[in-house]
Amino acid sequence: MNFLCILFVVSLISSLSKCTTSSMKRELDLGMSRGHSGSQVGKALLGIQSANRTDGPGRKRRSFDLYALVNAK
């Protein structure tokens, strides 16, 4: 949720910078003006963020009861 809020603020700043600095030689480029690549970066960052979470995708490491394995019949 926080990442989406940050992404929204960055896109808002990018759109504001285009309006105010259109006559400037060097503009602030935050990757949003490049079209599809900006969304690709956003998806990659969301994927990395979800992979780092404990309940995210990937192999689940289960703790098991060693006593139950030894005494299983």
Curated annotation (Swiss-Prot):
- Asked whether the keyword Signal is assigned, the reply is yes
Name the propeptide positions. Answer: 61-73
- Give UniProt keywords alphabetically: Amidation, Cleavage on pair of basic residues, Secreted, Signal
Compartment list: Secreted
Q: What tissue specificity does the UniProt entry give?
A: Expressed by the venom gland.
Q: Which GO terms describe its molecular function?
A: diuretic hormone activity; G protein-coupled receptor binding
Where Proline amide occurs, residue numbers?
57
Regions annotated as coiled coil = none
Would you indicate the residue range of the signal peptide? 1-19
Quote the cellular component terms of the Gene Ontology held in the record.
extracellular space
What does the record list as GO biological process? body fluid secretion
The record, for PANTHER family, names:
DIURETIC HORMONE CLASS 2 (PTHR41146:SF1)
**What is known about what this protein does?**
Regulates fluid secretion.
> Of which family is this protein a member?
Belongs to the diuretic hormone class 2 family.
Report the protein name in the record. Answer: Venom protein 55.1
Q: Which organism is it from?
A: Lychas mucronatus (Chinese swimming scorpion)
